[in-house]
Curated annotation (Swiss-Prot):
GO biological process: proton motive force-driven ATP synthesis; proton motive force-driven mitochondrial ATP synthesis
Matching CDD domains: F1-ATPase_delta
Name of the protein this chain belongs to: ATP synthase subunit delta, mitochondrial
Pfam families, A to Z: ATP-synt_DE_N, ATPD_C_fung
Gene: atp16
Originating organism: Schizosaccharomyces pombe (strain 972 / ATCC 24843) (Fission yeast)
Claim: NAD is one of the keywords in the record: no
Subunit relationships: F-type ATPases have 2 components, CF(1) - the catalytic core - and CF(0) - the membrane proton channel. CF(1) has five subunits: alpha(3), beta(3), gamma(1), delta(1), epsilon(1). CF(0) has three main subunits: a, b and c.
Length: 167
């Protein structure tokens, strides 16, 4: 793949018939049609939480660190780690969701798309139950069964993020 991209960079245009042009390709001189506000779409495999809703800000737990996304944010794709997504609507009301991971894509048109396997309102969690589960799975990490220990390590990682978010 890299050889193809390097070849394309050296050539002034694509060789005839080598690559079919993708949909929506644009040149540097063409402007992108932008929304006036940040527009959020957030979906799970079984439910859409937001569908093209104008918002003020979205805070995400990216693998590279916590990020606040506002209107006119640079286009990017981020892998999300377990943590809290905070959505600030136009009335400055905040909604917080705990996610187990996922992806966020910021388009040049001010559209932010978030896809996650699981998302739950933060207020639906019990801090005491989360702490109890964390202690239980920390103990399971010392299991002699590698499978049990590996599953416990994943659960501990997610539960530690949840316990931090609930404080």
């Amino acid at each position: 793949m890299f050889r193809l991209s390097n070849y394309m960079l050296r050539k002034s245009q694509f060789p005839q018939g080598l690559v079919r042009a993708p949909f929506g390709i644009r040149g540097y001189a063409q402007a992108v049609q932008k929304n006036e506000k940040l527009v959020l779409s957030m979906a799970l495999p079984y439910q859409t939480i937001y569908e093209k809703v104008p918002v003020t800000q979205v805070d995400i737990p990216a693998e590279d660190g916590e990020m606040g996304i506002l209107k006119d944010h640079v286009p990017m794709i981020q892998c999300l780690k377990p943590g809290v997504i905070s959505v600030t609507d136009e009335s400055s009301n905040k909604s917080k969701y705990f996610i187990s991971g996922g992806f966020a894509v910021q388009q040049p048109s001010n559209e932010l798309s978030i896809t996650v396997p699981e998302a739950y309102k933060l207020e639906d969690f019990s801090s005491s139950v989360a702490n109890q589960l964390l202690e239980k799975h920390k103990a399971e990490m010392n299991s002699s069964d590698e499978g049990v220990a590996a599953e416990a390590a994943v659960r501990v990682s997610v539960l530690e993020s949840l316990v931090r978010a609930l404080k």
